[in-house]
């Protein structure tokens, strides 16, 4: 099934707007209102340019077969497994955090209608949601199949946006009593919170790059002029949502804001619906994390399988020098074609990731996510470290590297100005990604 631009926009927007949208007002606390808005715009521009670069470099592999693995192997085959591992860890960690959110909110939601201790147990709620909703959606092979789920999730985000705006425009007396000091410029920095603590919220608010190649592969055309519309629309909408929720939430509570804004609203029908909306959002977002994680795990397993085959072939060819070189050259070229051809999730029509492999990897992700989610109530620090490494790698470092190394290589003489701009913007994104990785790791390790 060929995907449309609209379904691509919905999928990308849904991937970007996860549960982190609830923390956007909190991100303003050490920055102040105006610097906070500037950070949202700056990080949005960086994310959009990174997605544009992904759209540009997709042409360097056969149409419908673009992926991080295929492109990484064009630059340096040895780096492929490193970035596949980063994607798998990042997506798995975010998926687990979604289930932890379900475990935190579902008992609060159910308490409105029942006092049954079994139904108010967080592990029971995680089990039910995983079994009846998350697992079936995670077995879908194409992102386009999740377009209706994405529509529901985006509707949930829209409701949250309206809820935050309404409470800002017409606050209750209880909310007014919670209001703290508002800073329009940088406020005085405190020991327990500074800009490094909330910087990752801005930087990773637009992380959706791990699904960009899947979306490109499912489009009827991979031409840049066609594909660029998807990140342009999706990131623009995300930017509007983040500014609306971030500004309204911060102006409502000032420096008394907390990490999950909806927890500050008094018990009411509107806030209960808001909690349900959050559960819908994260529940439907889990498959969007499972999708690239599954592909990356498959690539890692395939890498080791190919390595074993290569070692066996080398051992078999050792007796003669004449047969030692030519088979290895042929194997090398075949390996590259196989890598591009076997992009599991990124090429659904000709994927080897089906049957037993597809089921085993998907079940492993689901079971591991479930076990971690019911065992741990907070992954804040771990996810901060995973985000600083995995998210930065796939959002800035790797796309930037692709852009700088690949864009313009098709030109033998003069390189057009537009191509040069994309090429060197890739280098800037690569450097930006390294700076952000170091900064956010410092924040996660020393300031939390």
Swiss-Prot record:
Superkingdom, taxonomy of origin: Eukaryota
Gene Ontology CC terms, in alphabetical order: fungal-type vacuole; fungal-type vacuole membrane
One record GO biological process: amino acid transmembrane transport
Vacuolar side, ranges: 29-32, 102-125, 172-195, 251-267, 379-381, 446-448
Pfam families, per database record: Aa_trans
Entry membrane topology: Multi-pass membrane protein
GO molecular function, one term: L-histidine transmembrane transporter activity
Spans through the membrane: 8-28, 33-53, 81-101, 126-146, 151-171, 196-216, 230-250, 268-288, 358-378, 382-402, 425-445
InterPro entries noted in UniProt: AA_transpt_TM (IPR013057)
Residue positions where Phosphoserine is found in the record: 344
Residues in the Cytoplasmic compartment per record: 1-7, 54-80, 147-150, 217-229, 289-357, 403-424
Subcellular location: Vacuole membrane
Family, similarity comment: Belongs to the amino acid/polyamine transporter 2 family.
Physiological role: Involved in amino acid efflux from the vacuole to the cytoplasm. Capable of transporting aspartate and glutamate. Requires ATP for function.
Protein name stated in the entry: Vacuolar amino acid transporter 6
Organism: Saccharomyces cerevisiae (strain ATCC 204508 / S288c)
Lineage, top ranks: Eukaryota, Fungi, Dikarya, Ascomycota, Saccharomycotina
Gene: AVT6
